[in-house]
Regions:
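A six-helix transmembrane bundle that forms the core substrate pathway of small-molecule transporters
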Residues: 89, 115-116
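Secreted/periplasmic carbohydrate-active enzymes, especially glycoside hydrolases
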Residues: 1-90
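Substrate-binding/catalytic cleft of secreted carbohydrate-active enzymes
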Residues: 93-110, 117-261
Length: 261
């Protein structure tokens, strides 16, 4: 990747240096071209466009690297090296994780690895009272201000699977997730204010009002971006080969642990 050394110097009226900051910067454009729905009859779209070119994404999710987060940084470079060896060009910072150390983003910048960044919420419906919303606002503001400078950052996503969490409860699949205040109002307004250059996705998978109305309930099968957790017996099972998602941001198989573990 092409990074540049940039120095910002602030002088007082006498020409004396007040403060100075040096950073590595990258120059690029990024947009997310997506539709609100996808069907067999009307296939949708979900594609990242970097410097006016569509990118075929080959990526992975990034989860907590250690049960003790104080040791996370020691694991970052070996895992990034593995991503490079696998020819990954995107890492999705999964919403059940923690906001990663600056070293992670620096390595992604240096190696041209795009970062899809969930805000750190996932898999449930969160409180909506004013006290909780203020805590989310404070946390998100700190995260955006710290991470927004990295050219590897290509997306903020409101959460992991909060939109589809209602689908897992028998009494909640008809609760419209598009009314949820954190992902629909609070976070997008903060991204527009603090990092307007970076696209925002309310949830992953995102159930738009159009997708909700089309299905009449929460159903990610009408969303162009999906998480595919199905049968593990065969990777070419119809569950995978006949799926109409335009972008699969989460999928997995059971892995064999190392003997040492």
């Amino acid at each position: 990747s092409s990074l540049y050394n940039a120095t910002l110097t602030i002088l007082d009226k006498e020409g004396e240096v007040v403060t100075e900051d040096e950073q590595k910067i990258g120059i690029r454009t990024v947009t997310l071209d997506r539709t609100d729905t996808t069907t067999k009859e009307e296939p949708g779209e979900f594609v990242f466009i970097v410097n006016h070119e569509k990118i075929f994404v080959k990526g992975t999710n990034w989860v907590a690297l250690d049960a003790l987060h104080s040791r996370d940084q020691a694991h970052i470079k070996p895992n990034i090296d593995m991503m490079i060896d696998l020819n990954c060009n995107m890492i999705r910072m999964w919403g059940g994780n923690v906001y990663e150390h600056d070293y992670f983003y620096d390595l992604c910048d240096a190696h041209g690895i795009m970062v899809w960044h969930d805000f750190m919420m996932g898999c449930t419906q969160y409180p909506q009272d004013d006290i909780f919303l203020k805590k989310i606002e404070d946390e998100a503001a700190k995260a955006i201000a710290r991470i927004r400078k990295h050219p590897s950052l290509v997306l903020w996503a409101g959460n992991n699977e909060n939109d589809i969490a209602g689908e897992w409860n028998e009494d909640q699949p008809y609760v419209d997730p598009t009314k949820e205040p954190i992902s629909r109002y609070l976070l997008p307004s903060m991204v527009r204010r603090l990092d307007p250059k970076t696209p925002y996705l309310p949830s992953s998978p995102y159930i738009s009002s159009e997708a909700f109305n089309l299905a009449g309930r929460i159903d990610q099968n009408f969303a162009p971006e999906q998480h595919l957790w199905g049968p593990r017996g065969y990777y070419k099972a119809p569950f995978y080969t006949e799926n109409i998602a335009k972008f699969v941001s989460e999928i997995g198989y059971h892995g064999c642990p190392s003997r040492e573990s």
